């Protein structure tokens, strides 16, 4: 009987949890796909990298056509081209809110009824009624945070939108001892915002998705155990 009750309880927990919630247990929150904030009927699809065309050799020339880019713009404009993303975030926010509300209400009612019917006067019927109500609330909240992140990462042009804007995506992993630091960047850029050094600053990236985290021994220790996360998910306190 106890075993059956435990099975039923576990089934109820799993049903109420849902597949999406279970996938998030033990993992960092997933970032939304690039382009999901745009008003498109469908999200922009990533295109496959184009094949590089064969260089045509000319027997009467000392130079190869593949290197004929003396006056060519070296900025990323095609699918598969690379560009450098400069990330320099120094955000600081400080908020302080105080709210106070007070309300007072008072109601008084007095009545007196005397009826003379066929010469008969009943006893006097009169009364008083009053109500008083008071309510008040006070609330305080404050936020004080600062974040600094300075990195550079190479990204690849993965797609070109209909209006000519570029969809880029880049990733970088660095392993130090048993900890892997992961940097991901993705977003939509305008070709004219890419400077002559083929570099673009992060604040010029629309729908920017910048993630800097890691995985390894230190990250595992900093996260609460999976069982505790499941319990916290259903705990009402």
UniProtKB/Swiss-Prot annotation:
Low complexity biased stretches: 124-140
Task: List the cysteine pairs that form cystine.
Answer: none
Which terms are listed as keywords in the entry?
Bacterial flagellum, Cell outer membrane, Lipoprotein, Membrane, Palmitate, Signal
Q: Which InterPro entries match?
A: Flag_Lring (IPR000527)
How this chain sits in the membrane, per its record, is:
Lipid-anchor
Specify whether Lipoprotein is a keyword of the entry. Answer: yes
> Where is it mostly found?
membrane
Covalently attached lipid (N-palmitoyl cysteine), positions = 17
Lipidated positions (S-diacylglycerol cysteine) are: 17
Where is the protein found, in the record's own terms?
A: Cell outer membrane; Bacterial flagellum basal body
Domain of life of the organism in this record?
Bacteria
One of its Pfam families is: FlgH
GO CC terms of this entry: bacterial-type flagellum basal body, distal rod, L ring; cell outer membrane
**Membrane as UniProt keyword:** yes
Q: Which GO terms describe its biological process?
A: bacterial-type flagellum-dependent cell motility
- The signal sequence is 1-16
Q: Which GO terms describe its molecular function?
A: cytoskeletal motor activity
Q: Where is this region: Disordered?
A: 122-143
Q: Which family does it belong to?
A: Belongs to the FlgH family.
Q: Outline what the protein does.
A: Assembles around the rod to form the L-ring and probably protects the motor/basal body from shearing forces during rotation.
Subunit structure, as described in the record: The basal body constitutes a major portion of the flagellar organelle and consists of four rings (L,P,S, and M) mounted on a central rod.
**Name of the molecule in the record:** Flagellar L-ring protein
Please name the source species: Allorhizobium ampelinum (strain ATCC BAA-846 / DSM 112012 / S4)
Instruction: Name the lineage.
Output: Bacteria, Pseudomonadati, Pseudomonadota, Alphaproteobacteria, Hyphomicrobiales
- Gene (UniProt): flgH
